[in-house]
């Protein structure tokens, strides 16, 4: 399928992309958190930021920016540390709200839509490993002798975004379901927010330690 467009082993790619999307990360965690704290509509808003960020990174990978980042350690480190600091800030903010007894699932209901979109977009764009991953993963399924590899890249990118959309939808509706349960379980809600905050801090440490 899509072999005429320079795509190799498409269904193998789909299976690989599916399992890659399932790997927990700051983006999926933020979408789940938003779904729990703000409902379906804002959950999809957070997911939109992730989709836009991933689309930008995939385009940059195709345009050759990945090679520039890979061969320029200073540029790689700048993006890496900015991403780590941002994750640390998000995690610290959540932990502080738990300490101050502010349940984000209730008190955070008035958070502006623009803030949610910006946060999810920044989370996607400040991960230098993502753009390098797109190149290393996509190249395995592109026929380099094809007339237009841009079309091949577009097919693979669109497929990945569709798989991501389905998984994000599952997270968002799961989050909305959890919200209804947590309305009567305030201590459990605080514990959940604290754990998510700690996970963000952990993601920050992992990103900062990447080489």
Swiss-Prot record:
Keywords annotated in UniProt: Amino-acid transport, Antiport, Cell inner membrane, Cell membrane, Membrane, Transmembrane, Transmembrane helix, Transport
Main localisation: membrane
GO cellular component, one term: plasma membrane
Highest taxon listed in the record's lineage: Bacteria
Membrane topology: Multi-pass membrane protein
TM helices/strands, residue ranges: 5-25, 49-69, 72-92, 122-142, 153-173, 191-211
Locations listed in the record: Cell inner membrane
Catalytic activity line of the entry: L-leucine(in) + H(+)(out) = L-leucine(out) + H(+)(in)
GO biological process: L-leucine transport
Keyword Nucleus: no
Molecular functions (GO terms): antiporter activity; L-leucine transmembrane transporter activity
Pfam family membership, one: LysE
Homology family: Belongs to the Rht family.
Task performed by this protein: Exporter of leucine.
NCBIfam families per record: PRK10958.1 (NF008201)
Protein name: Leucine efflux protein
Species the sequence originates in: Enterobacter sp. (strain 638)
Source taxonomy: Bacteria, Pseudomonadati, Pseudomonadota, Gammaproteobacteria, Enterobacterales
């Amino acid at each position: 399928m899509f072999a005429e467009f320079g795509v190799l082993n498409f269904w193998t790619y789909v299976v690989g992309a599916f399992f890659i999307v399932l790997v927990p990360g700051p983006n999926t965690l933020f979408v789940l958190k938003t779904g729990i704290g703000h409902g379906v509509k804002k959950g999809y808003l957070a997911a939109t930021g992730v989709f836009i960020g991933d689309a930008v990174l995939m385009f940059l990978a195709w345009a050759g920016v990945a090679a520039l980042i890979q061969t320029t350690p200073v540029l790689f480190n700048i993006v890496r540390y900015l991403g780590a600091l941002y994750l640390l800030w998000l995690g610290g903010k959540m932990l502080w709200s738990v300490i101050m007894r502010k349940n984000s699932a209730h008190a955070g209901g008035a958070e502006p839509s623009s803030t949610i979109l910006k946060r999810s977009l920044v989370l996607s764009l400040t991960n230098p490993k993502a753009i390098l991953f797109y190149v290393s993963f996509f190249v395995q399924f592109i026929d380099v002798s094809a007339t237009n590899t841009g079309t091949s890249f577009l097919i693979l990118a669109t497929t990945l975004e569709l798989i991501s959309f389905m998984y994000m939808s599952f997270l968002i509706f799961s989050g909305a379901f959890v919200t209804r349960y947590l309305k009567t379980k305030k201590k459990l809600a605080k514990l959940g927010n604290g754990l998510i905050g700690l996970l963000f801090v952990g993601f920050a440490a992992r990103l900062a330690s990447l080489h």
